[in-house]
């Protein structure tokens, strides 16, 4: 297993100080009810042009300093009861690290867990929002000359959509220091904290981190088309999305895996995160997601056409419900859905699968000036049965980061139906 050595650690200050009128950033109810974790993303660049080889860190630091002036809550401090951020311009934590192996050793490994070395130790998915900077960046240098750029952002301030906007704006600034981002930290105007609510009771309990294993699988565009054809020919489903058909397949493989272990079928619950932008404006920064809950109570409902039909129905029902809902009601409804899911998890009546998506965000093309990454990934998730969908590096396919227990992964990765439509992702960086 590769190890890392910290070369330097510093705080990146804002290029322009935050105006006193923006010093107190009110958190929204959506922010408040999220798990206070650091979400970890990493971008791998194996070949650095010679004109950048000696100034990568300088480019990242200078551009980060400027972009933080627009994303100022990331350089502040979250208060103890998660109601506001003191935008005191403390800065973002920035580490320079040396990795004692070539990048190919990481990217060609069958399991994704080895990428954890490019993240600050013990930070990914941890509840460190009060003790660490809301943004922690690590630049990792490999023996081969390649680099990885990782960013861990506090989920209290950002959801995945906002993280993608920030990374894209940071990269645009790195390429052109005249670029001006336009984020709006106004989520609390749409989702205000209700004054009558006992805030401490809405805070989610943090769960101890557990070690699982992750593998990334690729669904090529042609295989996604095959899956869509299967679904549409055997049902009344129209225009299934690539995430819907891929979700249905990994869900079915999960059910097969579970039945191999227990010898019987167990009902399932799958959750998908849905972005609320729109109707919320696209440049609204903060947490603005709701969850879609889909169940399969029988083996027949697990079949691809049937499960995709249920996914689409549940998605449309949620859209219809939210369409007529006042914005200040949305957080309470989201909290209600979350509590329903937690009750099912605690009762252990269903196998639960958690899905989130970072598709159509441009993260697979993040270019700080030295080209696009060959791999975008996350640190190993603490929750088992977790599926994260991302755009593949080229084309219209999907990459899916799958986290399971070690024993379950051994069964899952040998599933013939999975391997008919998806393949493990490994890269050659030579």
Curated annotation (Swiss-Prot):
<comment type="subunit">
    <text>Monomer.</text>
</comment>
<comment type="similarity">
    <text>Belongs to the plant acyltransferase family.</text>
</comment>
<protein>
    <recommendedName>
        <fullName>Acylsugar acyltransferase 3</fullName>
        <ecNumber>2.3.1.-</ecNumber>
    </recommendedName>
</protein>
<dbReference type="GO" id="GO:0016746">
    <property type="term" value="F:acyltransferase activity"/>
</dbReference>
<dbReference type="Pfam" id="PF02458">
    <property type="entry name" value="Transferase"/>
</dbReference>
<keyword id="KW-0012">Acyltransferase</keyword>
<dbReference type="GO" id="GO:0005985">
    <property type="term" value="P:sucrose metabolic process"/>
</dbReference>
<keyword id="KW-0808">Transferase</keyword>
<feature type="active site" description="Proton acceptor">
    <location>
        <position position="367"/>
    </location>
</feature>
<comment type="function">
    <text>Catalyzes the transfer of short (four to five carbons) branched acyl chains to the furanose ring of di-acylsucrose acceptors to produce tri-acylsucroses such as S3:15 (5,5,5), S4:17 (2,5,5,5) and S4:24 (2,5,5,12) acylsucroses.</text>
</comment>
<feature type="active site" description="Proton acceptor">
    <location>
        <position position="155"/>
    </location>
</feature>
<dbReference type="InterPro" id="IPR023213">
    <property type="entry name" value="CAT-like_dom_sf"/>
</dbReference>
